[in-house]
């Protein structure tokens, strides 16, 4: 009787594990980025600077990019459409623009990519020289 019970239990458990859904692929396994962070040197007085990130779907399934969220209103990111479906084996360029008016020094902003594979944070920085112009009083 005990043998039959344990055989039945083993059969039920093996069926349970065989039909379990596969673990979702993590963002680090599904998406490969050309860089996690980018920095631009710009001229004093520049109004803006642009960055590009290239992401490749290295998984065997589509990944949907649901949202791009910049850390502030001076930074914007664009994809061809939202949500954007990135097919298995394909890549896409994410264009990022940072407004620089009135800023000096090293400015760093983040961009959070919300996808079906998880969240990814990218960093953009602009190094704006300090304005060294001096004004003469007459």
Residue ranges and their predicted role:
Residues 58-61, 102:
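Short, acidic/polar linear motifs in exposed loop/turn regions
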Residues 19, 51-57, 96, 109-114:
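Buried hydrophobic-core signal for structured, non-transmembrane domains
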Residues 5-14:
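Sec-dependent N-terminal signal peptides
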Residues 104-133:
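Terminal connector regions
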Residues 45-52, 101-110:
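Short, solvent-exposed loop/turn segments enriched in Ser/Thr/Gly
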């Amino acid at each position: 009787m005990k043998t039959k019970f344990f055989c039945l239990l083993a059969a039920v458990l093996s069926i349970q594990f065989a039909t379990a859904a596969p673990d979702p692929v993590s963002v680090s396994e599904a998406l490969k980025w050309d860089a996690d962070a980018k920095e631009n040197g710009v001229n004093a007085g520049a109004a803006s600077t642009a960055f590009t990130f290239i992401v490749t779907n290295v998984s065997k399934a589509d990944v949907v990019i649901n949202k791009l969220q910049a850390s502030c209103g001076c930074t914007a990111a664009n994809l061809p459409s939202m949500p954007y479906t990135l097919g298995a084996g394909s890549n896409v360029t994410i264009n990022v623009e940072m407004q620089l008016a009135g800023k000096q020094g090293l400015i760093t902003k983040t961009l959070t990519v919300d996808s079906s594979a998880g969240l990814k944070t990218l960093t953009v920085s602009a190094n704006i020289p300090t304005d060294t112009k001096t004004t003469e009083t007459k």
